[in-house]
Amino acid sequence: MKIFVDENIPLMTVRALREMGHIVTDIRNTPDKGMADDDVWAMVQREKQLLITTDKGFAQYRNKQHHGILIVRLRKPNRHKIHQRIIKAITQFSEKKWHGILIVMRDTVQGVWRSADRN
């Protein structure tokens, strides 16, 4: 699966996703580091990638057509907790099921929203 990880995702997660066979774009390794959310969104859609972030602002795109959004929102985040929640979500859904899905992973629960525009 093609995945884009925002700057706030642990490097251990990037490595684990690559070891699982995913094609991962890590913005930290590009000249685009620090780009605006709208520009990140446009790039992710152009490249047909699942977006993984801790930035709740990306939830605003949930009703648009997209290739999946995974937002991790924890009360006391640390890289190990963020990593665990991401790996759990990635293994829970197949690549085809991510299309048009927003998942918010919290400490003990997860929320799932399906886009109104899942074309």
Label every model-predicted segment.
Residues Q49, H66, K76-P77:
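Short, charged/polar surface micro-motifs in flexible loops or helix N-caps
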